[in-house]
Amino acid sequence: MKIYYNNVCPNCSGRISNERLIKGLPCENDYPYEEGTIEQVYEYLKENNKLKDWANIYNIEKAKKEFEEFFYKAVNNKPWSAQRAWFIRAYKGYSFSIIAPTGMGKTTFALVNALYWGKKGKKVYIIVPTRTLVKQLYEKINVFAERVGFDNIIVAYYGNNKQKKEAKELIKDGAFSILITSNQFLSRNFDLLKNNYFDIIFADDVDSIMKSSKNIDRILYLLGFSETTIEKAMQLIKLKISGKDLEKIRKMEEQLKELVRKEQRGILIAASATGSMRGLRVKLFRELLGFEVGAAKTTIRNIIDVYTEMRDYKKQTLELIKKLGNGGLVFVPTDYGIEKAEEIAQYLKENNIKAEAFYSGKSIELLDKYANKELDVLVGVAHYYGLIVRGIDLPHVVKYAIFVGIPRFRFSAKEKETKIGRILLLASTLSDYADEEFKKKLNTTYNMIKRVSTGALKMVEEAIEQNKELDGFLEELRKNIIYLRDKSFELINREDIIKKLEENPFIALERGDGINILIPDVKTYIQASGRTSRMYPGGITKGLSIILSDNEKLLRALEFKLKLLGIDLHPGSSS
């Protein structure tokens, strides 16, 4: 079945069929043939004076091939798919995170990328955790440089006093193309660095570099941001956290955009093995560079987010799938459960939609069927670590997401929580209604958690579940969390607090068999809906996310929190 889409031709932004989009071609008006490479299409459009946005696709493809050849010459191996994707992001001027375990090619990419851009007159700074790594990278990059014929100056700060003195002179004068130092050098010798502007900064093991919040500011200065701009961004972050004045937030966002627009700025590539970045100033990267260090994905997003009121959710879901076709993901909230996912999948099958419920324990072969379009949709639970949310990487297949109910956290006044994350979320939600001791304990607990590993937190959680004591610091943390859990439980069972919660525009309450507090799960919504959009050589594909809202108050809370992240929810047709 041929479907036509308005405003999505990759060349003229006009009307185009799904068949031509699948083939990677522009519309028939621009290019009348049924096949052709990016280069062939480019030449035809150019010769016939029809070349528009396809020029960007062609230029990116050309640069990618050039980089692949350069990489092969330097390393004697072709770059793998992730390294090619990282290059495309850098070429397009995006700052971004690389979250991957060691041995995945981050450092090799950093060195070859530095040489590639250094040859084109750009200035690159590579920051690593230790001086030993500085030496290793310097030796490695010189091998690569010889292979590709790189003659520009590469400076690395390590070695004996004479070598360090020579390096400092070159750094002070800015007489280099590529600089490699430890993060300790960045902290101790910023006066030498501060007059340099860098087109690209690659921060290897950003977790250790950013332990000093001052290094965040230093990196931003070196990328071309002024102190005024950085402070304005910090004011905006604090205002967003307060969540008190949307209009003031919008105005400050516009002011910040204008400041950033006037300043020359480079890009930051932040590599991390864990993605465990915490702290307020880290959020400066989101406001100034458009991404979060250590986030699951960059904030670059090309998704239309739509909501409509839920009425007959099965019928509405069926009608949407019939209109949108294959490539759909259907999500139900965690409190609806697997049973609801199975129920919806069964209803869709009864109405000639090829659908299956997909969750942990289901055959992985269902993914192959979905990828091969033997299935139209998968139905699962909207849980942040759920299989359908995190375990699907099929950007060429997934086109849209339907949320049958708003993703949320549900807290019951009948039972105490045992999971640390949920205890702290509930405590944070109730902190405005608690005494000073509660607030102080909550703040202390958050600071303590920053100091412990994931494994240690797991030990504390198990001790809470099994009612066991620990030793030392971890026991103090366990006691704090239990205090917060018990006090939170008391608060949500007080009628005066319940009345105040009912007046809160961002918290939904359910009265039935006891009181339930509902809070929107923003992270899961962003992660799940993000399955519908992907980066490709010409840009980012457009996805569609549709929410069937089952709670007006919860919807408004989600809308507000998404707005703070720069994501707008749009009302859809109620038909």
UniProtKB/Swiss-Prot annotation:
GO cellular component: cytoplasm
Highest taxon above the source species: Archaea
Domain Helicase C-terminal residue range list: 316-465
Major site of localization recorded for this protein: cytoplasm
Signal peptide stretch: none
EC number of this enzyme: 5.6.2.-
Localization, UniProt: Cytoplasm
Zinc finger (RG N-terminal-type): 1-39
GO molecular function: ATP binding; DNA binding; metal ion binding; reverse gyrase activity
Residues engaged in binding ATP: Q83, A100, P101, T102, G103, M104, G105, K106, T107
GO biological process, alphabetically ordered: DNA topological change
Annotated keywords: ATP-binding, Cytoplasm, Isomerase, Metal-binding, Nucleotide-binding
Keyword Cytoplasm: yes
InterPro entries assigned: DEAD/DEAH_box_helicase_dom (IPR011545), Helicase_ATP-bd (IPR014001), P-loop_NTPase (IPR027417), Reverse_gyrase (IPR005736), Znf_Rg (IPR040569)
A Pfam family per the record: zf_Rg
Quaternary structure and interacting proteins, as annotated: Heterodimer of an RgyA and RgyB subunit.
Function: Modifies the topological state of DNA by introducing positive supercoils in an ATP-dependent process. Binds to single-stranded DNA, transiently cleaves and then rejoins the end, introducing a positive supercoil in the process. The scissile phosphodiester is attacked by the catalytic tyrosine of the enzyme, resulting in the formation of a DNA-(5'-phosphotyrosyl)-enzyme intermediate. Probably involved in rewinding DNA strands in regions of the chromosome that have opened up to allow replication, transcription, DNA repair or for DNA protection.
UniProt record similarity statement: Belongs to the DEAD box helicase family. DDVD subfamily.
Domain writeup: Introduction of positive supercoils requires the cooperation of both the helicase-like and topoisomerase domains of the 2 subunits. The helicase-like domain probably does not directly unwind DNA, but more likely acts by driving ATP-dependent conformational changes within the whole enzyme.
Leftover remarks: This enzyme is the only unique feature of hyperthermophilic bacteria/archaea known and seems to be essential for adaptation to life at high temperatures. It may play a role in stabilization of DNA at high temperatures.
Protein name, UniProt field: Reverse gyrse subunit B
Native source species: Nanoarchaeum equitans (strain Kin4-M)
